[in-house]
Amino acid sequence: MSLYPSLEDLKVDKVIQAQTASSANPASQAFFLNVVDSAAFPPGGNLYPKLYPELSQYMGLSLSEAEICENMPVVSGAPTQGQLVARPSSVNYMVAPVTGNDAGIRRAEIKQGIREVILCKDQDGKIGLRLKSVDNGIFVQLVQANSPASLVGLRFGDQVLQINGENCAGWSSDKAHKVLKQAFGEKITMTIRDRPFERTVTMHKDSSGHVGFIFKSGKITSIVKDSSAARNGLLTDHHICEINGQNVIGLKDAQIADILSTAGTVVTITIMPAFIFEHIIKRMAPSIMKSLMDHTIPEV
């Protein structure tokens, strides 16, 4: 079963497959040519002139043939037998004729499974990390920019399963911070589950440059009817954590809007249910989130 980063990709891929199947079946076309009066054909001789929509204008998207070929090279010609098409790491199962090889999707990808990171304290004895207890688990509340925690790829919402081999289940926030404070500074080993409360939604801007949602204080409040946001299942009462992999927590709405407007035609946002988000950031001043939170664009 094929997987797609967005509904637009699924629909366009179906159109491409149907057009390819039609052009690759001359026997079928010959049969219809024998039974249908050629005088009934529309100008240009196309048997099915409006059976499938033109890809240049589809679902509110502007898709020229050049853009399709650039984002999905396989469309321009079928691969020869045995030829492998290189695709990016863990998203290689995605079929993306519209989205293509988008860096934002790769930066925002939530990886399933558990990983281990090793970090050390800086010259001040810090690792640039704040933790929060949620439902008997320990979660990342804050990652400071250019800190050891940031350099090993920790993100807001990551779940910490172990610190130096000790299970964190049932710990309080204070105990987690105490263990980190007392840990040997040269090597701290942490076992991490990647952002279990978060999910990503990939959308495509329409001709006016919008994806179709309204937010206030970083929280999604409304979805525009028939927009890409609506088609791809974006929900209200969710907080925006990242845009194309860039953390936007603590930023003003105008700053978030600017990041959205300057993003490309494909926008992938990472969201978290509001009640969980608000619990994680509880007792953390907005000024701390704005000034200390790592808002850099991650490398891919």
Swiss-Prot record:
It is a peripheral membrane protein. The modification Phosphotyrosine is found at Y48. The keyword Nucleus applies. The modification N-acetylserine is found at S2. A motif (LYPX(n)L motif 1) lies at residues 3-7. Its main location: other. A motif (LYPX(n)L motif 3) lies at residues 51-55. A 1,2-diacyl-sn-glycero-3-phospho-(1D-myo-inositol-4,5-bisphosphate) binds at K252, D253. It is found in: Cell junction, Focal adhesion; Cell junction, Adherens junction; Cell membrane; Endoplasmic reticulum membrane. Residues 116-195, 200-274 form the PDZ domain. A motif (LYPX(n)L motif 2) lies at residues 47-51. GO terms for biological process: negative regulation of receptor internalization; negative regulation of transcription by RNA polymerase II; positive regulation of cell growth; positive regulation of cell migration; positive regulation of cell population proliferation; positive regulation of epithelial to mesenchymal transition; positive regulation of exosomal secretion; positive regulation of extracellular exosome assembly. One of its GO terms (cellular component) is interleukin-5 receptor complex. GO terms for molecular function: cell adhesion molecule binding; ephrin receptor binding; frizzled binding; growth factor binding; identical protein binding; interleukin-5 receptor binding; ionotropic glutamate receptor binding; neurexin family protein binding. The modification Phosphoserine is found at S6. Phosphorylated on tyrosine residues. Residues 2-104 are annotated as: Interaction with PDCD6IP. Multifunctional adapter protein involved in diverse array of functions including trafficking of transmembrane proteins, neuro and immunomodulation, exosome biogenesis, and tumorigenesis. Positively regulates TGFB1-mediated SMAD2/3 activation and TGFB1-induced epithelial-to-mesenchymal transition (EMT) and cell migration in various cell types. May increase TGFB1 signaling by enhancing cell-surface expression of TGFR1 by preventing the interaction between TGFR1 and CAV1 and subsequent CAV1-dependent internalization and degradation of TGFR1. This is Syntenin-1. It comes from Rattus norvegicus.
